[in-house]
Amino acid sequence: MLKNKTKKTEVYALCRHISLSADKARRVIDQIRGRSYEETLMILELMPYRACYPILKLVYSAASNAAYSMDSAEVNLVISKAEVNEGTITKKFKPRARGRSYVIKRTTCHITIVVKDISLDKYEEIYSFKNPIWKNTIDVYSNGVVWHKK
């Protein structure tokens, strides 16, 4: 049986109203989701997109939040969730010929990055592997490898 530990393992950093298209930010976020902190920094510094700089600042902020609240080292951090949502759209009017006006839409986005410390295990094991309670739904090979029945 697995029991939840009460220690917090995830922290997040949120940046709102960035003057950037959500689709262009998602292109960068998809590259860093699930990677380690150090690998993420290398990727963001070398990618040639404008969206990399605010995301890089946000990853730094999430790492400093993790160091402050969980006392975790940067080596153990992994980007567990990263999402981009559309923000508000501001409209400006550009004057055109014959007294007409043309609407220019400035899109914004909200970016959330969740960092997880992998050194802090989320579950503590109460029963040993020698006597598992899940033996009726999952079989074990003779060499000890677990596989799911389907």
UniProtKB/Swiss-Prot annotation:
UniProt keywords, alphabetically: Plastid, Ribonucleoprotein, Ribosomal protein, RNA-binding, rRNA-binding
Gene Ontology molecular function, alphabetical: rRNA binding; structural constituent of ribosome
Localization annotation: Plastid
InterPro entries: Ribosomal_uL22, Ribosomal_uL22_bac/chlpt-type, Ribosomal_uL22_bac/org-type, Ribosomal_uL22_CS, Ribosomal_uL22_sf
Gene3D superfamilies: Ribosomal protein L22/L17
Pfam families on file: Ribosomal_L22
Keyword presence, rRNA-binding: yes
Function per UniProt: This protein binds specifically to 23S rRNA. The globular domain of the protein is located near the polypeptide exit tunnel on the outside of the subunit, while an extended beta-hairpin is found that lines the wall of the exit tunnel in the center of the 70S ribosome.
Family: Belongs to the universal ribosomal protein uL22 family.
Stated name of the protein: Large ribosomal subunit protein uL22c
Protein's organism: Orobanche minor (Small broomrape)
Encoding gene per record: rpl22
